[in-house]
Amino acid sequence: MDNSTGTWEGCHVDSRVDHLFPPSLYIFVIGVGLPTNCLALWAAYRQVRQRNELGVYLMNLSIADLLYICTLPLWVDYFLHHDNWIHGPGSCKLFGFIFYSNIYISIAFLCCISVDRYLAVAHPLRFARLRRVKTAVAVSSVVWATELGANSAPLFHDELFRDRYNHTFCFEKFPMERWVAWMNLYRVFVGFLFPWALMLLCYRGILRAVQSSVSTERQEKVKIKRLALSLIAIVLVCFAPYHALLLSRSAVYLGRPWDCGFEERVFSAYHSSLAFTSLNCVADPILYCLVNEGARSDVAKALHNLLRFLASNKPQEMANASLTLETPLTSKRSTTGKTSGAVWAVPPTAQGDQVPLKVLLPPAQ
C-alpha cells in the first residue's frame, strides 16, 4: 500500500470483463424478488398469527432477503462503474456488511426450517414443545445475533481499496488479507457446509419417515420428496459455487500469499458466483408460495384481494382477506392441516412417533 496515494499495488484484475452480468442479474432479482418477498412476508405473518412456528422462520427469511435486495441498487451502480465505489467508506461498510451477512443468515434460516420440518414429520409428538412460536422467536434471535456478530469484523477495517487504475474496490482486495482468508474458512465450514450437512440429515429423516408411512398416497410422497430436494437445491445451486471459489482463493492465499496468478484467473468466475447467490432471494418465496396448488391458490386470492382493495379503496376488505399457507412442508403442528384441495389428517397412534399421513380429498364441487 502506498500511504501517500492510498493506492494498493496488488493483483492486476480486469474489472471490465464482468461489468454486465452481475448488474443484469441484480436488476432481475430486484424486479422479481421485491414483490414476491413482500407477498411471502405477508403470508408468513398470517402464519404467525395462526400460531404456526414455521411462519416465524419464513418471516425472518423474507426480512433478510428484503434487506439484501435494498442493497442491490448500489451494487448495480458499482459494477456498471467497473468495480468503482463512489458512495464513500461508510456506505461501503454498511451495504457490504448487509450484503455478505445475508448469505449466512439465509442459510441459517433455511436450516432452521429443515430442522423444524424434520421434527414435525419424523417426531411430531416427542418434540412438540420445541415447535412453538416462542421457541422459534428465540431461535431466530440467536440466528440474527450470531450471524451478524460473526460477520461484523469488516466493520472495524477499511474496506475501500484503490487500485493502480484509480478504481475504488469495496469489500474486495486482490490478493486478500490474511485475516480475511481465515474468516473465509470460517464462513465456508461453519456458515455453509455445517448447516447444509445438517439439512441433508434432516431431509434424509423426512424421506425415511414419509417412505415408511403406509397411509400416505404415492402422489403425496412424491410432492414431499420434491419439496425436500428443492430446499436442499436452493443452498447447493445458489451458494455452493461461491463458497467453492471462496475456499479456493483463501487456501491458495494462505499457501502462496504473493501469487496473483490464481486471483487473476478466477476473478470473473468469482464475481459471477457471488452474483448467483442473489438468486436465493427469488427462490425462497417461489419455493414456499408457488410450488403447489394450494399455495398458488392462496397467492391468487391474495393478489385478487389486493386488486379489489386498490380498485375500491376499502381498507376493510383487505383486512378481512384471508390467506392460509399450508403445504406438505408447511403444515401446522395440529393434527389436521388444510390445503386447497386436500386435508392432511394425522390420526392418533400408540406407535410412538410413527404418525401416518393421510390425504382426504374433498367432495367434487
From Swiss-Prot:
Disulfide bonds join 11-260, 92-170. The record marks 147 as: Required for activation. The record marks 157, 167, 271 as: Proton sensing. GO terms for biological process: adenylate cyclase-activating G protein-coupled receptor signaling pathway; angiogenesis involved in wound healing; G protein-coupled receptor signaling pathway; glomerular mesangial cell development; negative regulation of angiogenesis; phospholipase C-activating G protein-coupled receptor signaling pathway; positive regulation of inflammatory response; positive regulation of Rho protein signal transduction. Residues 48-51, 124-131, 213-216, 292-365 are cytoplasmic. Gene3D superfamilies: Rhodopsin 7-helix transmembrane proteins. GO terms for cellular component: plasma membrane. Activated by a network of residues that connects an extracellular-facing cavity to Glu-147, a conserved charged residue buried in the transmembrane core of the receptor. Protonation likely drives conformational changes in extracellular loop 2 (ECL2), which stabilizes movement of transmembrane 3 (TM3) and a series of rearrangements that connect the extracellular-facing cavity to Glu-147, a residue only conserved in proton-sensing G-protein coupled receptors. The keyword Disulfide bond applies. Residues 1-10, 83-87, 159-174, 253-262 are extracellular. Pfam families: 7tm_1. Proton-sensing G-protein coupled receptor activated by extracellular pH, which is required to monitor pH changes and generate adaptive reactions. Activated by an optimal pH of 6.8-7.2. Ligand binding causes a conformation change that triggers signaling via guanine nucleotide-binding proteins (G proteins) and modulates the activity of downstream effectors, such as adenylate cyclase. GPR4 is mainly coupled to G(s) G proteins and mediates activation of adenylate cyclase activity. May also couple with G(q) and G(12)/G(13) G proteins. A multitude of proton-sensing residues, which include extracellular histidine residues (His-157, His-167 and His-271) or triad of buried acidic residues (Asp-65, Glu-147 and Asp-284), contribute to activation of the G-protein coupled receptor activity and pH sensitivity. This is G-protein coupled receptor 4.
